[in-house]
Amino acid sequence: MFAESYGIGANDLANAFGTSVSAKALKYWQAVLVAAVFEFLGAVLLGANNTDTMKSGVADPKAFESRPEILMYGMLCVMIAAAFWDIFSCTLELQVSTTHTTAGALMGMALASYGSDAVIWSASSSTFPGASALFMGWGTSPILAMFFSGTLFFLVRTFVMRSKDPFTRALWVMPLAVWLTVFVIVFTVIQTGNKNKTWDTVANGTAVWISVVVAVGISVSSALVFIPFMKRTIAVKDAEQYLQVFSACTMSFAHGANDVANAMGPFAAVYYIWQNSEVPGSKVPVPTWILAFGGVGIVIGLATYGWHIMGLYGAKSVMISNSRGFCIELATAMTVIFAARWGIPISTSHTCVFAAVAVGCFEGWRGVNWFMVLQTICAMFITL
């Protein structure tokens, strides 16, 4: 379990922070500190819903009811295979999706155990409807990421960067960006809590106004604290740098919510079978210590091995500035949090790459390293 979460931190999380480090909004050690705090929070607050998805949404537990020990050892093989590929690909400086690694290992284990009947290809559900939704995510997550990042960068470039007084505009944009980001996070936490029975009495309308109030409070507080400080600076990039740091925090939170499931899902099944000697159902509570342990492993992976590919994404895909990095990170976070809310396991790395593609296209087709995009797509299929 620790080895798999370690590989996720070294490969996937390093890609997530590539924009911040490449744009010099964060130094490497600062990125590690940000990840240590917000990765942990995302894993604990939102990780439970997605962990349940990866545990029982790909391999059909009913196929293993007569032999629960097969599922337990199968999940152990899934963790070993995923950990090996994540760390090995990181050594080769190959950017891969840890989500696809775990999902592919789960499907392979199920097929090897009981054939195609042991795989949930499609199911009627309000969240993750079987393995087919994973393939659907290959198309929907890039589209959503490109839409969000393209829209954000268009607005920033048109109304801030190319205005007569870009610095003043940047100061006005910061509270709005903070409000939008906090609203998305708070609303998602409450909605996910409904599924985990921690906010089960909160209606959707109540969740909206709670999110609005919290977002307004934090955005106003940030404006009162940071705007007077930033007025002493003379460069627009200084104001944008603070926005990118905030978006990096959001990105880390979203990554913890989405990717902790990859490592903890199989282990949660192993732990349940070991305790109860039976196959877990579709809804089994995941102990908080499992989520926390996964978050710790991811952070350690970034701190000790993430340097292998930290700059691979940010420096070679598109030209990265603070404004571009902010739009890429915020768009990726919005896409990943949306997916975590509905229990759809998507790739943070690939989402981030396609968000960068949309931003790079504003500089023309030469503004994107299309070879790297093709390499990312090929790695997606090879990994699965």
Tell me what each language-model feature is.
Residues M1-L384:
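Alpha-helical transmembrane segments and immediately membrane-proximal extracytoplasmic
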